[in-house]
Amino acid sequence: MEVPAWRKTIGEMVRDHMRSPEMEHYFSVKMNKPRARLMITQLGLYIRHRRDCWALVSANCPVMAVKQAILQHEYGEVIKDQFSDYGHLHLIIRQAEKLGMTPQEVIDTKPIGTTTATLHAWAWITHAKSWIEGLSALTVTEWTNDDRLLNDVGGGHSTRMGKRWTDDMGIAWRDMPNFVAHSQADEEHSDMFLPFLERYAVGEKEQMALDAVKESLDLFGGEARHRHRQRDALCAAHRRHRRGEIRHELVEGF
């Protein structure tokens, strides 16, 4: 396939994924601080893990032009770009501060079980499979943030989740730097690897690349759903804790 055909094919796969009942439910859940804290800290782990995965794809790939593109991609993610002079993890830290969290809390975050499983799966794809499959699996997750592709269904992941944060917690868009950055930077990232798929994902490798895209979208959706369930569990625990405090105060009052 040529670049336009790759863009159309992957684009439709992403649109189908983002319109799925599971993702619609994910975006419909009311956001609050316990849920938001879990989300932003697990996203921090995801961003850090991406660096390992892109390095694995580069190590598996013999094509210097692909290695150069990955380094260009990673410079903005790790070093600096127009959104941060300190890399994109700094955006997570700044956004978490709006939830009352410290930088150290973000850095010291432990993954929940489903995060661990999902990150291990992406690591396996990028390590054990071909570089074409690894590249396809990684780049498609950035397509889920592409507002150009998803505008008619409410926007990409960052835009839609940012709206939830604003509607449910009153946090302004400008105070969500991670969402702001990835709603824009990932549009560029969606395009940058398509020429390599056109050139190298040919013959049977074409279907291998598309299978990797599908597998990665399934991982992305599954991780989001499980994170949502964990947020619900945390909120339920928080409510039980608050009810216990209130009962204690009532007893003390007597």
Report each predicted region and the residues it spans.
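Non-heme di-metal
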Residues: M1-F254
